[in-house]
C-alpha cells in the first residue's frame, strides 16, 4: 500500500535477480519471526529448528544464491541480535503481552499481524513501564515503517479497554547480520500520537480513492459438526471380519492370482 522509492530503485538495479533476492529476504524474515515467537513462548531455540525451517520452507531457490550454512548464518546472526535485545530489556522489567497475533476489527479497513506487544521501559532510568507494539525488521530501514506500526496499534487499541494495556508507543526492532564481533540490534521508538495515526489514515484514504474501498472480509466460521448420508445402508448389517475370515480372503486372492 505504501510506496517505497528506495525499494523500487533497488529492484531496477538488480533486474532479473530482484525477484529471487526479494523472496530470499522474505524467507529470512519469515523464519526470524517464527523463531522469535517460538523463543518467547518456549524459552529456547536450537539450530535443528532453524535448519528444518529452511529445508521445509515454500521458497527453495535460495540454493542458487547461497549455501545452506551461509543461509543459516544470516538467520542465526539476526537471532543473536534479538537475544541481546531481550537480555538488555528483560532485567529492566520487560513483560511480553502478545506475540505474533493477528489483528482484525470489522469497523477498521485494514488488518495485519503484529509481532510483539510488551511492557517495556523507554530508558534504563525510567520509573514506569509503557505498553509498546514492536515490529521486527530484518532488512533496511525505511521512513514508512512507523506508519505500519501505527496501523497495527490502532487495531490493537480498538479491542483493548484496559487502559494499562493500550499501546502508547510503537517501535521497529532492526535485526541485521553485518555486525562483526558483538551481536547488535537497533530499536527505534515513536510515540503513538495523533500525528502518526493521521499520516497513515491519509495514506489509506488516498489508496482507497485510487483503488476503491477496501473491505476486510469477516473470517469464515469453522465447521463444528459433520454428517454423512447412510440411508442406503439401512438394510445392511455392518460387521467386522474376524482374523480367520480375513485369512481366508487372503488365501482366496492368492489362489486367484495363482
Regions found by a protein language model. Name each.
Residues 101-234:
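Nucleic-acid nuclease catalytic cores
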Residues 88-97:
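Structured nucleic-acid-interacting core domains from mobile-element enzymes and related host factors
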Residues 76, 81-88:
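Active-site cradle of extracellular carbohydrate-active enzymes
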Residues 38, 42, 85, 119-123:
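Short hydrophobic alpha-helical module
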Residues 248-258:
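Long, low-complexity, intrinsically disordered segments
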Residues 224-250:
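Cysteine-cluster motifs in flexible loop/terminal segments that predominantly coordinate metals
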Residues 1-79, 96-101:
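Nuclease catalytic cores
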Residues 39, 43, 89, 156-159, ...:
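Solvent-exposed amphipathic alpha-helical surface segments
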Amino acid at each position: 500500500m505504501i510506496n517505497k522509492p528506495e525499494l523500487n530503485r533497488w529492484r531496477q538495479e538488480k533486474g532479473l535477480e530482484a525477484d529471487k533476492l526479494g523472496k530470499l529476504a522474505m524467507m529470512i524474515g519469515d523464519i526470524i519471526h517464527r523463531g522469535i515467537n517460538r523463543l518467547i513462548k518456549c524459552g529456547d531455540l536450537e539450530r535443528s529448528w532453524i535448519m528444518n525451517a529452511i529445508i521445509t520452507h515454500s521458497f527453495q531457490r535460495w540454493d542458487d544464491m547461497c549455501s545452506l550454512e551461509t543461509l543459516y548464518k544470516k538467520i542465526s546472526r539476526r537471532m543473536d541480535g534479538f537475544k541481546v535485545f531481550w537480555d538488555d530489556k528483560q532485567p529492566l522489567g520487560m513483560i511480553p503481552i502478545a506475540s505474533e497475533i493477528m489483528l482484525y476489527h470489522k469497523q477498521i479497513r485494514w488488518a495485519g499481524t503484529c509481532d510483539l506487544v510488551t511492557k517495556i521501559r523507554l530508558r534504563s532510568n525510567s520509573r514506569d513501564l509503557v505498553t509498546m507494539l514492536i515490529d521486527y525488521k530484518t532488512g533496511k530501514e525505511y521512513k514508512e515503517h512507523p506508519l505500519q506500526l501505527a496501523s497495527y496499534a490502532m487495531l490493537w487499541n480498538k479491542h483493548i479497554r484496559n487502559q494499562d494495556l493500550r499501546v502508547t508507543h510503537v517501535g521497529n526492532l532492526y535485526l541485521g547480520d553485518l555486525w562483526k564481533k558483538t551481536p547488535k540490534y537497533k530499536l527505534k521508538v515513536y510515540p503513538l500520537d495523533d500525528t502518526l495515526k493521521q499520516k497513515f489514515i491519509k495514506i489509506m484514504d488516498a489508496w482507497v480513492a485510487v483503488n476503491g474501498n477496501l473491505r476486510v472480509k469477516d473470517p469464515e466460521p469453522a465447521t463444528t459438526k459433520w454428517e454423512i448420508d447412510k440411508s442406503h445402508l439401512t438394510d445392511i448389517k455392518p460387521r467386522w471380519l474376524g482374523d480367520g475370515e480375513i485369512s481366508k480372503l487372503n488365501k482366496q486372492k492368492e489362489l486367484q492370482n495363482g
